[in-house]
């Protein structure tokens, strides 16, 4: 959907004129209101096509069929995109969303909980170990603080990773885009 909207915003692609607000609203609603029933419909189409991305393409064509403006350019829904272009970008978006909405918030909660334990047990003595052998005295709080600092460092590294995708055709040379 976003690909089709982007095509309509390119002056150089005259075959896909700029969409009206109504057509853009319809496309936005397909994304925003995507339902389990929609997913079932795609799986139903896929049983015929034996191709996941082609099933999504046909589903989108069904959704825009009653809009004359979008129906007129529906062959551009999959224009210049291989299935891998679509899939890897989808996977990248899903991974990024999972990282931002699930993983990092959970790790933040974990860091906070371990930091609280470090404060709570800051005076509780324990024997530190090195190579599995008793070493020197420390506190449970200090050891928990070490874990929190190390986890925070790893969290920052995970957050800094750029999750990328590609959209450059079957062999990466943009031939379909020319």
Question: What feature does the model see in each segment?
Answer:
Residues 1-177:
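A helix-coil-helix interface module used to build multimeric assemblies
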